[in-house]
Amino acid sequence: MNQSRIVINTLVAQRAHEEGTSQLAIIKHLLPLGYRNFELRREYFNGNFAELEELAALKLKYRLVYFYSIPENLFVDGHLNIELLQFIAEARLMGANYLKMTLGNFDGHNINELQRLNRLLPDSMQLNLENDQSLANAKISRLVDFFRVANENNVQIGFVNDLGNWVYTKQDEQDATRQLLPYTRYVHLKDYETDNGINTTSFVDSQLDWQKLLKQFAAHLPVALEYPATIDELKNDLNVLNNFVI
């Protein structure tokens, strides 16, 4: 796989975050790996806008690309999330061009709210929705219906296929991938183990047929690693992905 497609989600440094390391410091620690695409997690920020400005400076210095993961629903009580402009402002401040949220309670009748997205979202930003670990936000038929309506109304919004999340909603990842492929702009690659509940793990030596899954996606789509890992584990997994031939 072309290295330029690979994204590192800061969840890989979960332990460092739990020990108080800032997201800025996490990115600086990961830079020597040689990758330039990073997914930043909103829940990892401490509310200090100075950190966002420093991340923007870091982006310019090293020519980084930022993806912004926002653990919030796009639709709340049938309307666009009232914090959406805040999320966009944060993304602008740090220089993130890709936003990720979850669907929320869109019911097909709030078309006017959906169309507002074209006015609110800057042309330089791409908004994508992810299947999380809840059936409310990850039911395949519901997601397909939403993206169909969005397309019919010329609303530019895409899908993030989190391959390791389908197990939480007891849906088949192969079927989900096939049905949502026309809308997919981004992929999260991880696996799960079920020895003690369901836990997120590396895709290497996984229960998922990740090779078969990845071969279904367009060759330019970004692929993010999103699971806790040590630096040595991360290096190994990045090497496996780099050597994967589509």
What positions do the PLM features span?
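Generic enzyme active-site microenvironment
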Residues: 37, 128-130, 160-163, 224
